[in-house]
């Protein structure tokens, strides 16, 4: 009897049953060859063990199969059909934009679907005003009398002081670009540079953002239109509603300035001005000099009373859209990283805007 053949040595095709009735098979390589990761002859005493004069032992195979929790092809297909795969991949797609994201993703863009009624109306943007913005003095109106007073004065000097006090991410990036060797104006949209002002915030690198400039421009435009409310027509209000709704919706989703209290104050100012601009639309008397809605069916002029009815229907649609924007404004104000007094002020402004838009909606409920 060969001394190297022990009782622990079994042929490679040896099988045994366990307590559960499953068949266990031995490895095709002995333990020594398996540990050394070399080819084994598979004999009861392999050539390598016989050459080295060591005991040749064959162990049972390890548990075969996929790791616990893995998915096979059919399971993945069923999950795709049920929509679970998309839900797993959705959080990864909703991460903040990286280095290659263009500025267009952070510019004020509409986050909500535009009302179908507003989409069917062709709007010509009002003429650009060359006049310098003057002080905005809110005048008494039924809406403000019932919703809590007048809007505070907000002139061009205050705007300049505000923009100097509030350093936008774009300004900080542009100043740092001057120290960047070989940087061209075309590269400013894709450069991310951390500055001391941005390092003090929760984020260290932010994309270039034009939200503050956009909403300041909207304030100037609405103020120029409200200088003579008697000449403001329905098309002007529709145009400003679309522009302001898109700007505020993009601002609330912006990673750079969406958590700044000053930006929310600007949003409440422009919404208040827009609400004041909508009040002349409630006057259906023929004595007013404002442009009336002109409706023509072929060669027949259907303006007048039918135009007033259509105006009020469109105004109600505008109010619905603006109230959705104010709801998002109020929800976002709860998560601001600011003092409690500032957050409460912004929420009170949101409630005031809701009441004001509600008064306008009640005024359009009675059709002539």
UniProtKB/Swiss-Prot annotation:
Transcription factor that specifically regulates the thioclapurine biosynthesis gene cluster. It comes from Claviceps purpurea (strain 20.1) (Ergot fungus). SMART domains: GAL4. Transmembrane segments: none annotated. It is found in: Nucleus. GO terms for biological process: positive regulation of transcription by RNA polymerase II. Its main location: nucleus. One of its GO terms (molecular function) is DNA-binding transcription factor activity, RNA polymerase II-specific. Pfam families: Zn_clus. Residues 84-109 are annotated as: Disordered. Residues 30-56 bind DNA. InterPro entries: Stress_Response_Reg, Zn2-C6_fun-type_DNA-bd_sf, Zn2Cys6_DnaBD. GO terms for cellular component: nucleus. Keywords: DNA-binding, Metal-binding, Nucleus, Transcription, Transcription regulation, Zinc. This is C6 finger domain transcription factor tcpZ. PANTHER family: THIAMINE REPRESSIBLE GENES REGULATORY PROTEIN THI5, ZN(II)2CYS6 TRANSCRIPTION FACTOR (EUROFUNG).
């Amino acid at each position: 009897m060969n001394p190297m053949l022990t009782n622990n040595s079994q042929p490679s095709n040896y099988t045994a049953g366990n307590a559960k009735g499953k068949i266990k098979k031995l490895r095709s390589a002995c333990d020594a060859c398996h540990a050394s990761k070399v080819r084994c002859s598979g004999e009861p005493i392999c050539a390598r063990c016989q050459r080295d004069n060591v005991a040749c032992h064959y162990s049972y195979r390890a548990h075969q199969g996929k790791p616990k929790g893995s998915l096979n092809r059919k399971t993945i297909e069923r999950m795709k059909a049920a929509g679970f795969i998309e839900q797993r991949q959705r959080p990864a797609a909703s991460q903040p934009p990286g280095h290659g994201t263009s500025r267009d993703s952070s510019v004020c863009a509409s986050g909500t679907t535009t009302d179908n009624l507003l989409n069917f109306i062709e709007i010509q943007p009002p003429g650009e005003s060359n006049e310098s913005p003057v002080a905005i003095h809110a005048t008494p109106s039924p809406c403000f009398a019932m919703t809590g007073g007048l809007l505070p004065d907000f002139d061009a000097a205050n705007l300049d002081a505000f923009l100097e006090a509030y350093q936008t991410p774009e300004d900080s990036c542009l100043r740092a670009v001057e120290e960047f060797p070989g940087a061209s104006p075309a590269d400013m949209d894709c450069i991310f540079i951390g500055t001391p002002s941005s390092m003090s915030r929760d984020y260290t690198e932010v994309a270039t953002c034009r939200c503050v400039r956009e909403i300041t421009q909207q304030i100037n435009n609405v103020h120029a239109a409200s200088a003579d409310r008697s000449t403001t027509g329905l098309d002007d209000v529709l145009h400003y509603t679309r522009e302001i709704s898109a700007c505020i919706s993009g601002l609330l989703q912006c990673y750079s300035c969406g958590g700044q209290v000053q930006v929310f104050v600007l949003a409440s100012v422009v919404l208040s001005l827009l609400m004041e601009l909508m009040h002349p639309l409630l006057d259906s008397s023929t004595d007013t000099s404002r442009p009336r809605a002109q409706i023509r069916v072929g060669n027949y002029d259907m303006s007048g009373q039918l135009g007033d009815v259509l105006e009020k229907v469109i105004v109600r649609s505008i109010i619905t859209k603006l109230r959705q924007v104010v709801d998002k404004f109020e929800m976002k104000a709860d998560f601001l990283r600011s003092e409690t007094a500032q957050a409460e002020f912004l929420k009170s402004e949101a409630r005031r805007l809701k009441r004001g838009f509600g008064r306008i909606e009640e005024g359009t409920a009675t059709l002539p």
